[in-house]
C-alpha cells in the first residue's frame, strides 16, 4: 500500500512537472518518471509506444511536405474565404472549419492560421472573439478523435478491430457524434452575451488605443504546385480509409493481408510525401525546418514520455485495475469517460491517453472477440480523451489568447476559469452522450 502511494506520487509529480515545463518538457518529465519508478520503486518498464510514434512521424512528414509546397496555406485560404463570406455565422463556421481542417490534416495545429481571421471577422460583426475562438480551438481538439489519419484514431481502430469494430464503423460513430456536439455547443453558446461593445475590458482597451484596426491581408496567388500537393495529400487520406476498410475482417476485400493497417498508413503517408516532393518540385532538405514538422516531432517526444510512463504504472497494477474497473465501469459506464477526461488533462495527448489506458480497460471489462457486450462503452467514451483544454497551457489555447487583441479571450484568474473550459466540457460531454446513443446502434 505504501509502495503504491509513492508510485502514484511519482506519476502525478511527473505529469504536473511536464505540464509546468510545457513543450518537450512533457515528454522529458515522463522519462524521468519511468526512471524513478523502475530504478527506485521496483516497477518493470512498460511498453514504448513505437507504433503511435511512427504513425505521427509519417503523417507529419507528409503534412510538412504539403506545407512546404504551399498546400497547407491553400487549404487555410479556402477556410478563410468561407469565414469571410458568411461573417454572421462565425460562431458555427469557425468550429466547423477548424473541425474539418483537423479531420483532414490529423493535427489541431492548423487552427493557428485561422485565429487572426476569426478575431477580425468577429470584430467586424460586433461579436466577442472569445466565443468563436474557444469553439474553434476545442473543435480542433475533439476532431482528433474522428480524423482518419490521427494517431489516436489509428491506434484505437487497430486495438478494437479484432474485437469486431472495423475502421469504417468506428469513423461512422466518431465523426457524426463529435461534429454534432460541436454544433450543439455553438448553439448553446449563442445564448450567452456575445456583443463585443458590451464588454468593459474591450471598451477600456479601445479607449486606451490598444486595439488597432484589422489589417487587410494581401491576396497571394496560389501556385499550381500548392493545389497539386493538397490533392495528392487528400488522395492519400482517401486511399488509407479505403484500404483500411478493405482489409477489415467484416469486408475482407484484400486477402491475405500482406500490409497491416499501421504499416499501410506509414507507407501511404511516406509515399504521399515522396509524390509531393517529386511532382511539386520542393527541396526535401528544407522540410525539416517547417513549423508543422517541428511541432509534430515535439508531439512524438511527448507521446514517448507520457505514454511510456502511463503504461509502466498501469501494467504493474493491472490486476488491481481489473478488479475495480470490471464492476465499476460495467455498472457506471460514464466513469470511463471521466477517467479518460482526467487522464488527458495531464497526459496532454489523445494518442498517449488512449495508448496508456484503453488496453487495460479492455482487459478489465473482459472484452474479447466472443464477449463484446461492453465494447460500446469504449467507443462511446473515446472523445473524452480530448480534455487538453482544461489547463490553459496548450499551444493553440495560448495562441488564441495572445492573438485576440480585443482582450475577451482571457486566461482566467484562478487557472481554470478561462474562456475554453465551458465550451470544452460541453463539446466532450455531448460527444460522449451522443456516442452512448449511436455506438450501440452501429456496432
UniProtKB/Swiss-Prot annotation:
It is found in: Cell inner membrane. Keywords: Cell inner membrane, Cell membrane, Membrane, Transmembrane, Transmembrane helix, Transport. One of its GO terms (cellular component) is plasma membrane. The chain crosses the membrane at residues 21-41, 46-66, 99-119, 142-162, 171-191, 228-248, 264-284, 295-315, 327-347, 375-395, 419-439. The keyword Cell cycle does not apply. GO terms for molecular function: C4-dicarboxylate transmembrane transporter activity. InterPro entries: Anaer_Dcu_memb_transpt. It comes from the Bacteria. Pfam families: DcuA_DcuB. It is a multi-pass membrane protein. The keyword Transmembrane applies. Belongs to the DcuA/DcuB transporter (TC 2.A.13.1) family. PANTHER family: ANAEROBIC C4-DICARBOXYLATE TRANSPORTER DCUB, C4-DICARBOXYLATE TRANSPORTER DCUA. Responsible for the transport of C4-dicarboxylates. This is C4-dicarboxylate transporter DcuA. It comes from Helicobacter pylori (strain ATCC 700392 / 26695).
